[in-house]
Amino acid sequence: MFHPSRPMGFPMPDITILLSGIAVCFLAGVLGGLSGAGTGLVIAGFLAPIVGAKAVMPALAIIMLINNGSRIFYFFQSLNLKIVLAMLVLATPGSMLGAKLYVDIPVSFFEGALGLVILLVLIIKTWRRMSASGPVAHWKPQKIWWALGPVSFVYGFINTIVPGSGVMVLAFLSATCMTTSAVIANDAAIAASLNLVKVLLFRQLDALPDPLVLIAVACGIASIPGVWFAKWLSTRLKTKVQHGIIDGMIALSAIHLLFRAFG
């Protein structure tokens, strides 16, 4: 459980930290709005020295609830509710289990395993793209839907424990050959739903004191203009460029997880 060691839990940030935080959250919003990944990792890196490592995951639950909510709003036309609901059926129990075990579980093991799996998915996806004789749309992506159940549960569990683990479901959705906007919209809907569950659970576990809630809400709101800018920019980028951004963020996130696990 989170036990603040200072009055109100955290020192009041000065104006420099506040301005830096706004800039970081804006850029993180742009990155996530273009690729579906990276927002949590960037903000987590900024917050850790301010609120403490153990408070990062509870804070991110609120931040990403707000951030993903804005992605749903801006990319709503690409949302597939059937896929979202199907994944949430198993992801939600996994998220609840992860939240309850968060304070005691060895995170490094999951970071390493997740990083390796994500890199493997990306390599297979890239190989299939290079070896396909026709357009990407001819890959017959329905062959991988059998993995939806296991991926959903594992994602829900790890998402509560490891910052940046949302890239797992991003890699899965990307491998189904969805459009870029559909990947971002469906990933955001799944993540927002799970983050709502995590917020409620962390509050019950006393891991989200009021001062931390205020900091997290401020960070989440600061990221919304970045998502809007990403939506505007995405309509002006070529599809190949957007796919490249997504693949690049998936690879960087996986490498980052491996570095944290074994570095």
Language-model regions, residue ranges each:
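Glycine/small-residue-rich loop that forms an oxyanion/phosphate-binding "nest" at active or ligand-binding sites
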Residues: 81-125
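Hydrophobic alpha-helical transmembrane segments in multi-pass integral membrane proteins
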Residues: 155-163, 198, 253-263
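Transmembrane helix exit motif
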Residues: 68-78, 115-139, 231-232, 252-263
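Membrane-interface helix termini and inter-helical loops of multi-pass transporters
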Residues: 9-11, 99-109, 133-135, 202-214, ...
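Residues within membrane-spanning alpha-helices of integral membrane proteins
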Residues: 61, 114-118, 122, 188, ...
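Residues that define the loop-to-transmembrane-helix transition and helix capping
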Residues: 54, 82, 108-111, 181, ...
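Small-residue-rich hydrophobic segments that form or flank transmembrane alpha-helices
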Residues: 14-86, 151-156, 164-223, 227-231
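Interfacial loop-to-transmembrane junctions
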Residues: 228-250
